[in-house]
Regions:
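Flavin-dependent oxidoreductase catalytic cores
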Residues: 1-362
Length: 362
């Protein structure tokens, strides 16, 4: 089974081709990683690669309640608990840097932090706050040129802290409607400067963030996650020239020599299915222009994963929710064992219930 075969990612020797996808779990009380989180990730260290939950590079990026950050010494030391737990089991782990941008509430931000976005366009719907329950999304402030420069520098600083904390690398969250994706999408980016307008200009923020992280961690330790055609968090799900824009972005990311391109298909959860030709061409453009591996994610089972690996469509396959209730997912796939079903009610609640209490298969 190719899914269970080793793979070399940059200079990392992965024991298999299963990636634990990034999943927000809201257990970081005070936005600081803790021993409970270390236990959770350590339990799942048999994955070839773990990508952490979205982690804010600055106070401005903390849109949700109880998500972790990596912008302080305390957070760095909290994450060190996690990386040591994973490495003790022989695993590898990347941190996912996620700036929420407009996806947030001022009630979830620490004092002095600001809700910022490419344009002053509010999200629809409501968001959970620990202090006042469900609340409407607040309208963000449009980022100035200085705000953009500061945000890029914050990604650089966060990447440096991540390496100090022992992470094997960094994934840029450019998917699912968060800040990098907000710059890519014309619905959330209505600017008419160098960071808005045509697709190439909307790509600029993502590329500048990638360069900043490469400067801190090296290209071989930097990946990016994208979700073309995604609709999560009010993204457009498709627009004129989207394929051209994303293929150009993949080309430029390849030229930077990134370790991997991680593409997400959310059609299993109701989003439009990405155009297969666009995904294939993005992967080809990334690889042929100097990029490393491809990771595909979204609704996979072992059979589909094996098909895409053997065809060369991808090098690695990311699994998300199956890892929640199956910390021993790799072993279950190896043995053909049935999978436990996760409890959705505990996906985002604090504490160990539905987090570290799922047993391995007997």
């Amino acid at each position: 089974m190719q899914l269970l075969s080793p793979f070399t990612l940059g200079d990392l020797k992965l024991t298999n081709r299963l990636v634990m996808a990034p999943m927000t779990r809201n257990r970081a009380l005070g936005n600081i990683p803790n021993r409970l989180m270390a236990e959770y990730y350590g339990q799942r260290a048999t994955a070839g690669l773990i990508i952490t939950e979205g982690t804010a590079p600055s106070p401005n990026g903390l849109g949700y309640a109880r998500i972790p950050g990596i912008f302080s010494p305390e957070q760095r030391e909290g994450w060190r608990l996690v990386t040591e737990a994973v490495h003790a089991q022989g695993g590898h782990i990347f941190v996912q840097l996620m700036h929420c941008g407009r996806v947030g509430s001022n009630l979830n931000l620490p004092a002095g932090a600001k809700l910022l976005a490419p344009s002053a366009v509010a999200m629809s719907g409501q968001i959970w706050t620990d202090s006042q329950g469900e609340q409407p999304y607040d309208k963000p402030r449009q980022m100035t040129g200085d705000d953009i420069a500061v945000a890029i520098a914050e990604f650089n600083s966060a990447a440096r802290l991540a390496i100090e904390a022992g992470f094997d690398g960094i994934e840029i969250h450019g998917a699912n409607g968060y800040l990098v994706n907000q710059f890519l999408d014309p619905g959330s980016n209505q600017r008419d400067d160098d960071f808005g307008g045509a697709g190439q200009s909307r790509n600029r923020f993502a590329l500048e963030v990638a360069k900043a992280i490469i400067e801190a961690a090296g290209a071989a330790r930097t990946g990016i996650r994208l979700s073309p055609y995604g609709v999560f968090n009010d993204m457009s799900g498709g627009y004129d020239n989207i394929a051209e824009q994303y293929i150009q972005l993949a080309t430029e990311l390849g030229r930077l020599g990134l370790a991997y391109l991680h593409l997400v298909d959310h059609s299993s959860m109701g989003a439009p299915k990405p155009e297969p030709a666009t995904v294939t061409t993005m992967v080809e453009a990334f690889r042929t222009h100097g990029g490393g591996a491809a990771i595909l994610s979204g609704g996979y089972d072992p059979v589909r994963a094996e098909t895409d690996l053997q065809s060369g469509a991808t090098d690695l396959v990311a699994f998300g929710r199956p890892f929640i209730a199956n910390p021993d997912l790799v072993d279950r796939f190896r043995k053909g064992a049935s999978l436990a079903v996760p409890d959705f009610a505990t996906f985002y609640t604090p504490g160990p219930n539905g987090y570290t209490d799922y047993p391995p298969a007997q």
